[in-house]
């Protein structure tokens, strides 16, 4: 990872789905700028595509349905346990 504008920053990228998604482009750019990332996806099927992408840039991948308050809470708890406080979403 190069040291860029996001060096030592921790971020969340929501909605990673595949290598053509906007979220993937954002994750790649943030990683290239030095960020540590958590990427979310929705559902097991999407996770089969999203998790390897996230892993390829050293990011954590978590399943999170943003329409479910309990899922959001669970995801935030997991993020805090892994990265601590987020600097950007």
Feature map (PLM): residue ranges:
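Short-chain dehydrogenase/reductase
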Residues: 1-88
């Amino acid at each position: 990872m190069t040291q860029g504008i996001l060096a030592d920053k921790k971020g969340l990228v929501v909605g990673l789905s595949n290598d053509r998604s906007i979220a993937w482009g954002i994750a790649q750019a943030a990683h290239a700028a030095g960020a540590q990332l958590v990427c979310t996806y929705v559902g097991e099927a999407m996770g089969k595509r999203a998790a390897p992408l996230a892993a390829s840039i050293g990011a954590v991948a978590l399943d999170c349905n943003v329409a479910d308050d309990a899922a959001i809470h669970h995801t935030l708890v997991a993020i805090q346990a892994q990265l601590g406080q987020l600097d950007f979403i």
